[in-house]
Amino acid sequence: MDQFIVSVVRDIQDIAALCRQYDIQIRSVYIGGGTPTCLPIAGQETILQAVAGNFREIEEWTVEAGRPDTAGEEVLALLRRYGVNRISVNPQTMQQRLLDLLGRRHRVEDVFDMFSRCRKMGFSVINMDFIAGLPEQTQADMQENMEIVCQLHPENVTIH
């Protein structure tokens, strides 16, 4: 894992050098495309330090926190400390039977808890990811997902 962190930091530094060379200002940063919060917290902090140290004009900084089992208070506090203001909570579905079928390690209740923690910790924009077309998923399941979205009021919703 350490080599992965080193490679990510090197990529951040290389991109920052190119941005300086071509006078490009990065205003939006997205760390995701997976679940970066599953990395050891020291590795997460190393990546956050690299971003914060190389890009000082960030207006929107997103981290894909993914599953509730990877983003406890310590991780969320770390993200806020570095200025992350947009977070993606990715329940994928709000039906426990489908989460179990997918092998997800969280419960539906954990998503509600994580969403509430994110709000309390000051994340100004919360995105939620859902997947349409899961095995055994019904139209009623998707309807229920959207009803929950309406209750929680995330600023963004992504449906894959």
Protein language model regions, located:
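Conserved non-cysteine loop/helix-boundary elements of the Radical SAM core domain that shape
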Residues: M1-L18, I26-H160
